[in-house]
C-alpha cells in the first residue's frame, strides 16, 4: 500500500473537519433519546453506547459502503450500493441523516473538486469521491469513522452533559477502535452487512416523536 501524501491527508482533514458543511452537528443518531430514556447518563455509558454503534451498527456498515462505492466498476453498481445503504437505514430519521449529509457532501465536493458527484447518501458519496479524487481507501474510511465517532461524543458532551476533558478522553479511547473497524470492514464486501445495535436503532425510532429535542435525529 502506497504511503499517503501530505496533500491527501490534508484533503481528508478538510472533508471531515467540522468546518466542512455537511451539517453533522445537527444529528445525534438517536443518542438524544437514549439520554432522555436514562440509558446514557455519564461518560462510561456514553462510551459504551458509541462503541456499540461503531462495532455493531452504522460504524461497521458505513465502512462497508465506503469500500464498495470506492471499488464500484460502473454507475449502475454504484446506484445499487446506494440503494442498499438507504435500505439499511433503521428509521426514517436515520435515512434523513445519511441522505441529507450525502447531498451536502456531494454538493460542496463537486463544487470544489472537478468530480461528478450527486444523489448519493453519505458513506457512498465519500467512497465515490475518494476514488475520483485519488485518495487512499483505508485512510478515507478511518477519517470518516473517526469524524462520526467524534460527532457523537460532541453530542454526548452537550446532552448528558459531559465535561470537555471526559469527551476528549472518550475520543482518545475510541480512536484505535475506529482504526481497527475501518481496516477490517474496508477489506470486506456487502455480504458482511449486519446490524445488532438494537438499542441505538430503537432510540432512533423513538426520537422521531420525542417532545423536546436539540438534534434532528
From Swiss-Prot:
Major site of localization recorded for this protein: cytoplasm
InterPro entries per UniProt: UreF (IPR002639), UreF_sf (IPR038277)
Keyword Cell inner membrane (UniProt): no
Gene Ontology, cellular component aspect: cytoplasm
Coiled-coil ranges from the UniProt annotation: none
Biological role stated in the UniProt entry: Required for maturation of urease via the functional incorporation of the urease nickel metallocenter.
Family: Belongs to the UreF family.
Subunit relationships: UreD, UreF and UreG form a complex that acts as a GTP-hydrolysis-dependent molecular chaperone, activating the urease apoprotein by helping to assemble the nickel containing metallocenter of UreC. The UreE protein probably delivers the nickel.
Name this protein carries in UniProt: Urease accessory protein UreF
Amino acid at each position: 500500500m502506497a504511503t499517503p501524501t501530505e496533500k491527501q491527508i490534508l484533503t481528508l482533514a478538510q472533508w471531515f473537519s467540522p468546518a466542512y458543511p455537511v451539517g453533522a452537528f445537527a444529528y445525534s443518531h438517536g443518542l438524544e433519546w437514549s439520554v432522555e430514556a436514562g440509558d446514557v447518563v455519564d461518560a462510561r455509558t456514553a462510551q459504551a453506547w458509541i462503541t456499540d454503534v461503531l462495532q455493531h451498527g452504522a460504524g461497521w456498515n458505513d465502512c462497508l459502503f465506503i469500500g464498495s462505492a470506492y471499488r464500484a466498476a460502473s454507475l449502475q453498481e454504484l446506484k445499487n450500493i446506494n440503494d442498499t445503504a438507504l435500505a439499511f437505514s433503521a428509521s426514517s430519521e436515520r435515512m434523513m441523516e445519511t441522505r441529507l449529509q450525502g447531498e451536502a457532501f456531494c454538493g460542496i465536493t463537486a463544487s470544489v473538486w472537478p468530480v461528478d458527484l450527486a444523489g448519493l447518501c453519505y458513506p457512498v458519496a465519500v467512497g465515490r469521491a475518494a476514488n475520483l479524487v485519488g485518495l487512499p481507501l483505508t485512510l478515507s474510511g478511518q477519517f470518516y469513522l473517526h469524524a462520526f465517532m467524534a460527532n457523537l461524543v460532541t453530542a454526548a458532551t452537550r446532552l448528558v452533559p459531559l465535561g470537555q476533558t471526559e469527551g476528549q478522553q472518550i475520543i482518545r479511547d475510541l480512536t484505535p477502535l475506529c482504526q481497527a473497524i475501518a481496516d477490517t470492514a474496508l477489506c470486506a464486501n456487502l455480504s458482511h452487512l449486519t446490524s445488532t445495535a438494537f438499542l441505538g436503532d430503537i432510540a432512533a425510532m423513538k426520537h422521531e416523536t420525542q417532545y423536546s429535542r436539540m438534534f434532528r435525529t
